């Protein structure tokens, strides 16, 4: 039985195994507190995320189970990886991942990025997305604060808690507004991996400009700002809108012409502007894919087709439509944790 140590962080009890020391708070999210720590086993710094009360409701239980399954399945250099997981005596769940020193949001607010850093960061984002999308996973909440970076400029995408299967009947507002694809705002029901390409395009533009491209005050203002630059959405895109209210709103907007991005980004590399034009397209089906973007001339210094892997198998989303009680989710979660630790579940009492 592992020995647990208790610590108070921001008034929250952290119960961690004695393997981890030097707890320091690094961030607070909607679903948990994140601390940095030192792993005594490896000597490496790690991030420990406490999922608060994961078994309090079926919705929270399912969300935690989904995040755990995704962290276990996704294995790629540009995606955050799980190094340990445990349940404390108080029945909180702790995910342990590698610790990277900063994130893109902090970098962007501290200083302008030079061209080679912009290229290298965008390359790694798209390399990670190519893999994630090949696994049948959509991130849905890609933004600078979800993109971690270390001192070697290695980049990893994190926070897959909102990620969901590529299927119709998608739920509405999930990603931070500035980076949200128009089809999430307009269609509500059906969207696919292209939403991540839009978000990556917004992040790319922010790296080029040093400020958010579409800083909407609310979703109405957000959509209006997008049309000021990209023009009115094409009629075939408007016809995909499911909500009557949304349709009326879009049709009420003044007709606008697209402004060439070369006018907006006057000092940018023309190849960068060309790639951005292909990422920020209203019609998701005409948006460039991650694999296609990697082969674009702007990323030629880093592009290596032999080292841009796809997933070995699709992620199994069969659990995602299940409407199960907390106790069932708990048993499934325990089973996943035992599997992660390579424990024979027939021999081990929970």
Swiss-Prot record:
Highest taxon of source: Eukaryota
Short motif (TXY): ranges: 171-173
Domain Protein kinase: 20-299
Pfam families, A to Z: Pkinase (PF00069)
Cofactor: Mg(2+)
Record's signal peptide: none
Subcellular locations according to the entry: Cytoplasm; Nucleus
GO BP terms in the entry: stress-activated MAPK cascade
ATP-binding listed as a keyword: yes
Any one annotated GO CC term: nucleus
Keyword Transferase belongs to the record: yes
Enzyme class: transferase
Coiled coil region boundaries: none
Binding-site residues, ATP: 26-34, 49
Catalytically driven reaction(s): L-seryl-[protein] + ATP = O-phospho-L-seryl-[protein] + ADP + H(+); L-threonyl-[protein] + ATP = O-phospho-L-threonyl-[protein] + ADP + H(+)
Its job: Proline-directed serine/threonine-protein kinase involved in a signal transduction pathway that is activated by changes in the osmolarity of the extracellular environment. Controls osmotic regulation of transcription of target genes. Involved in environmental stress response. Via the downstream MSN2 transcription factor, may play roles in the regulation of growth, conidiation, trap development, fatty acid metabolism and secondary metabolites biosynthesis.
PANTHER family for this protein: MITOGEN-ACTIVATED PROTEIN KINASE
Free-text note regarding domains: The TXY motif contains the threonine and tyrosine residues whose phosphorylation activates the MAP kinases.
Similarity field: Belongs to the protein kinase superfamily. Ser/Thr protein kinase family. MAP kinase subfamily. HOG1 sub-subfamily.
Record's protein name: Mitogen-activated protein kinase HOG1
Lineage: Eukaryota, Fungi, Dikarya, Ascomycota, Pezizomycotina
């Amino acid at each position: 039985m592992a020995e647990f140590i208790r610590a108070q962080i921001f008034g929250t009890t952290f119960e961690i195994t004695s393997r981890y020391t030097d707890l320091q708070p690094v961030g607070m999210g909607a679903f948990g507190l994140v601390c940095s720590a030192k792993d005594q086993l490896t000597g490496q710094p790690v991030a420990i995320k406490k999922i608060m009360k994961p078994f309090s409701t079926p919705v929270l239980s399912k969300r935690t189970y989904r995040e755990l399954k995704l962290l276990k399945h996704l294995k790629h250099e540009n995606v955050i990886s799980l190094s340990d997981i445990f349940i404390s005596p108080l029945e909180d769940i702790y995910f342990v991942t590698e610790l990277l020193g900063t994130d893109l949001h902090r970098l962007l607010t501290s200083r302008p990025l030079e061209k080679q850093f912009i290229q290298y960061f965008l390359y790694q984002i798209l390399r990670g997305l190519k893999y994630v999308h090949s696994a049948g996973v959509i991130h849905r909440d890609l933004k600078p604060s979800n993109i971690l970076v270390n001192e070697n400029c290695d980049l990893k995408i994190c926070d897959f808690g909102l990620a969901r299967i590529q299927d119709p009947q998608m739920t509405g507002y999930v990603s931070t507004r500035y980076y949200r694809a128009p089809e999430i705002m307009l269609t509500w029901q059906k969207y696919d991996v292209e939403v991540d390409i839009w978000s990556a395009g917004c992040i790319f533009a922010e790296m080029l400009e040093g400020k958010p491209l579409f800083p909407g005050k609310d979703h109405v203002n957000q959509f209006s700002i997008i049309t000021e630059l990209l023009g009115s959405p094409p009629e075939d895109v408007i016809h995909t809108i499911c909500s009557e209210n949304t349709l009326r709103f879009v049709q009420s907007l003044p007709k606008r012409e697209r402004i060439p991005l070369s006018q907006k980004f006057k000092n940018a590399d023309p190849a960068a502007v060309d790639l951005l034009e292909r990422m920020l397209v209203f019609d998701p089906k005409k948006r460039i894919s991650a694999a296609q973007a990697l082969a674009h001339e702007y990323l030629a210094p880093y592009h290596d087709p032999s080292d841009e892997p796809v997933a070995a198998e699709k992620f199994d989303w069969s659990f995602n439509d299940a409407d199960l009680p907390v106790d069932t989710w708990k048993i499934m979660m325990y089973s996943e944790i035992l599997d992660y630790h390579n424990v024979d579940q027939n021999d081990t009492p929970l």
